Amino acid sequence: MMKIALTYSYNGSKFKGSQTQPDKNAVEDCLNFALNRVGIFKPVVSSSRTDKGVHAISQVSCVECGEFWNERFERLKNQINKHTKPYIYIKNIQKVSDEFHPRYDAVARSYRYIIYHDEQNVFLADYVHFYKTLNIQRLNIALKLFIGKHDFTPFYKVGSGEKSTVREIFYAKAYQIYKTKDAKFSAKFKTQKPTLTIINFKANGFLRAQVRLMVANALQACKSDENLYKFISNFKEQKPLTRMPSPPNGLYLKRVFY
């Protein structure tokens, strides 16, 4: 037997989260089914758990399989993808040590949150958070507060059984995308509103729903100077502006670092 790591993307709108479910409608369930079809019967172990509606650009899972597949990873990838398409796509397979654990060996994870400012579009509804307008300067001031090592008790879903609520955020910043080819000109002279706001986070780990709660609070904070000052004051006292997380459809697990 050997252990392999699968790197893959998935459309989270089609599943009830990533972790296996009793009704077999989770990402891991679909992946396990596909592996069973190619003769691999051990269940996968994943690096991160994502909620219903959350997507992944590069999730990592491990599974044990027979030595038959050693040096046949491209063939294995193609075989698995036949059974996971169109909502899960295996991008890479590699052999790892027997001691490797995709969750506990990860040193960092990054997430992306996409906010769409144009008119509502039913074809984008599963992939972005519709939000009419925001102040990018205030948003980045709010996001900067998250950087560093903090107790994120106010920013996670209670009852998820975490041993520690302390996490270290390495990066938290937003940028905007404009329709015009000359985005810098448009941003400088405010000739049009941005189409998208992209928020990127990187940390040594995240609590359940932490990213969505951080986004929700940052969006509340950027509504006005008063809200921003209140958020800054409340953050020191561990009092969030809201306990309602932002919608899951705009969130993407971007990368797991080892």
Swiss-Prot record:
InterPro entries: PsdUridine_synth_cat_dom_sf (IPR020103), PsdUridine_synth_TruA (IPR001406), PsdUridine_synth_TruA_a/b_dom (IPR020097), PsdUridine_synth_TruA_C (IPR020095), TruA/RsuA/RluB/E/F_N (IPR020094). CDD domains: PseudoU_synth_EcTruA. Substrate binds at Y111. Pfam families: PseudoU_synth_1. GO terms for biological process: tRNA pseudouridine synthesis. It catalyses: uridine(38/39/40) in tRNA = pseudouridine(38/39/40) in tRNA. It is an enzyme of class 5 (isomerase). Belongs to the tRNA pseudouridine synthase TruA family. Formation of pseudouridine at positions 38, 39 and 40 in the anticodon stem and loop of transfer RNAs. Homodimer. This is tRNA pseudouridine synthase A. It comes from Campylobacter fetus subsp. fetus (strain 82-40).
